[in-house]
Design a protein with these regions (language model features):
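Short alpha-helices
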Residues: 486-546
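An acidic, phosphate/nucleotide-engaging active-site surface
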Residues: 111-116, 423-503
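Short linear loop/turn motifs
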Residues: 162-172, 273-277
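Surface-exposed beta-loop interaction hotspot
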Residues: 172-189
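Short, acidic/small-residue loops that bind anionic groups at enzyme active sites
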Residues: 151, 158-168, 392-394, 398-406, ...
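Short, ordered loop/turn segments at secondary-structure junctions
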Residues: 164-167, 407, 414-417, 474-475
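A C-terminal functional module that forms or caps the active site or interfaces directly
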Residues: 550-554
Length: 617
């Protein structure tokens, strides 16, 4: 019987006993204690314990709080029996004033003088034994992703680091945790290569194990987390991706070690990364203790299956996937069905394809700075009136919701439309249809690099001004380049459409094209994503308290949804602007009349949102 194989058959209690005896066969605990949760441990002076516990509750993704001991307590009854936490881990780290000063196989072995790295700190007396130091300390136990590895394997998902006989790869990101007191640090993540075809399996399995960090916090390009090179992890070993694998990142409890280092507390101890405490808690458990009455983050005793996240590809370059709950996906699919009906026979089906709406909403949700571009002329003669009635309502609906979500929004139009569009936008602000004025730009067609210069700072494709371009009623996004009267307008593709086409080749900028009604649906879809806890957790990387959306915030988002009243006011403004209808080519006076079909679409879109709870939280 091989040594590694025999260890994998042992129970957590048997493995803890071997570690207490300093068995040299046990180092990294990944792959051990199948079917049980593992935990990280942090020993801190009692005076820092309250702040550190609050730090954990403010950053529940990486710091899944399991148990806090009493001062000097070496056992942890809710997690395991017959435990001495001073000896039952294979390797410990000793920290002094923000530095790792040594590693130990047992905290009971350290009785010599503990050197102090900072001249500003009081030195630890040589006569003080470790037991005296530990008597003033509190031990905090945190969840570990090793706890979901066996479930992944059972579901057919390869665990590459175990296959390769390595510790998991751990990286310091540039994403800041929510600070509390002296504790402030960047998020640390683990990376596991997952076959693209098995992403949803891995997401669901880990979501169902919240004690082991839950679902991933990022899937795709490491640079989006500030990780420059996967071959150089900050902790653990480099794990090789196999063909077809995607890098998937989970929040990691080693974040706690980074917090200890940055806090520069005089003395602290922890497990060594990858050398975890083995609990007796099954990996199927979602909670281990009853929350205290005043707990800000009570554990989930029952996970709602409708909130199970699904993964969706958002961008190839850079590679980015997003997560959203089954419930939100179903509602956005319903929105998509409504706008795909084209009741006014305006040719909007040319701008519609299955799953486009969800992709558009996810791309916008991940964006910070968005440019909304407009449709092109639908007449051959520049002297004739132009069709901008089709895009303005949808563009304003998108802009309203994006602004309420705190994103930067810029409207971009053809220079021939500038004066008219500005007047309409200003009037929309005055009427309260548009929440606030937004920058309005044009693309000059006098320069061959005009589109690139507008999209990127100084025309440098590595410095894009926007991370998403959405084209409303932009016929260049249709495969036949035709207007709604089925006339080919390819020869009329102007600077605005050139902007959209140029953006598609710039890394870091995603693009989508929607119809006018698609603009309304996007606004509703963004509302659904921002009230979806699974999606919000992913956007926030598992950081921040997991509380329900405030009523004030929810009301603001609701106020910025499309409405029948807003559409009627905007139609009135458009009718006064001398525009013509894109389908008939006739005056807008009759064509812009608010019809029962128009009322019906908006009402049905809003009904999808209001059905059931306003928020999934």
């Amino acid at each position: 019987m091989d040594s590694a194989g025999s260890l994998k058959r042992l129970s957590p209690a048997e493995l803890r006993l071997l570690m207490r005896q300093n068995d040299p066969r046990i180092t990294i605990t990944s792959g051990l204690a199948k079917g049980y949760q593992q935990a990280g441990v942090i020993f801190l002076p009692n005076q820092h314990a309250d702040d550190f516990e609050a730090f954990c509750h403010n950053n529940p993704g990486p710091l899944t709080f399991l148990y806090r001991s009493q001062q000097g307590e070496s056992s942890c009854p809710p997690l395991a029996g017959n435990v001495d936490i001073r000896t039952d881990i294979s390797k410990y780290c000793v920290y002094e004033a923000g530095h790792v000063v040594r590693t130990l196989s047992s905290l009971m072995s350290l009785t010599c003088e503990l050197r102090t790295s900072s001249s500003e700190q009081q030195p630890v007396a040589a006569s003080d034994s470790l037991s005296q130091q530990l008597s003033d300390m509190v031990c905090l136990y945190l969840g570990c992703s090793f706890g979901f590895e066996s479930k992944l394997k059972d579901a057919g998902v390869p665990v590459r680091n175990v296959e390769q006989g390595k510790n998991v790869s751990m990286y310091k990101s540039t994403v800041p945790c929510v600070p509390v007191g002296v504790f402030s640090c960047p998020l640390v993540v683990t990376m596991r290569p997952i076959p693209a075809a098995l992403l949803n399996v891995a997401v669901e399995v880990t979501h169902l194990n919240p004690l082991a960090h839950g679902a991933p916090v990022h899937i795709g390009e490491p640079a989006l987390l500030g990780i420059p090179d996967l071959s150089r992890p900050d902790y653990g070993d480099p794990v090789e991706l196999q063909p077809g694998d995607v890098p998937v990142f989970w929040a990691c409890g080693v974040t706690a070690i980074q917090a200890i280092l940055s806090s520069k507390v005089p003395l602290a101890f922890s497990h060594s990364p990858g050398c975890m405490f083995l609990t007796d808690i099954p990996d199927s458990s979602t909670s281990i203790i009853t929350p205290t009455p005043n707990s800000d983050n009570p554990p989930n005793n029952q996970l709602n299956p409708e909130l199970t996240p699904l993964s969706f590809l958002v961008s190839h370059n850079p590679l980015l996937y997003s997560l959203v709950s089954r419930r939100a996906v179903a509602k956005i699919r319903h929105l998509e069905m409504i706008i795909g009906e084209d009741p006014g026979e305006e040719g909007t089906k040319d701008l519609f394809s299955q799953k486009d709406l969800l992709h558009s909403c996810l791309a916008l949700s991940h964006s910070r700075s968005v440019a909304v571009t407009t449709g092109v002329s639908t007449h051959h003669l520049h002297s004739s009136p132009d069709q901008i009635d089709g895009w303005i309502p949808g563009a304003i609906a998108i802009a309203n919701m994006l602004l309420s979500l705190g994103k930067t929004v810029t409207l971009i139009t053809d220079s021939r439309f500038l004066e008219m569009t500005k007047a309409i936008v200003d009037e929309a602000v005055n009427m309260g249809v548009l929440n606030t004025a937004t920058p309005l730009l044009t693309v000059e067609d006098s320069s061959p690099n005009a589109a690139l210069d507008l999209l990127c700072h100084h025309g440098d494709t590595s410095k894009p001004r926007y991370d998403h371009i959405v084209a409303v009623e932009c016929r260049g996004t249709a495969t036949d380049r035709a207007n709604v009267r089925e006339e080919n307008v390819k020869h009329q593709v102007g600077p605005v459409e050139e902007l959209f086409i140029t953006a598609q080749d710039i890394s870091g900028i995603t693009t989508t094209g929607v119809s006018n009604w698609g603009g309304y649906a996007v606004a509703c879809g963004l509302f659904l994503l921002n009230t979806c806890p699974s999606h919000q957790r992913y956007l926030k990387r598992g950081l921040g308290k997991e509380t329900t959306t405030s009523q004030e915030q929810l009301q603001d988002w609701t106020d910025n949804l499309p409405s029948v009243e807003k559409e009627q006011l905007l139609r009135s403004t458009l009718m006064q602007s001398g525009l013509q209808n894109g389908k008939s080519g006739n005056s807008v006076a009759g064509a812009l009349t608010f019809t029962p079909d128009d009322n019906n679409i908006i009402t049905r879109l809003l009904k999808v949102i209001y059905e059931g709870s306003m928020s999934e939280n």
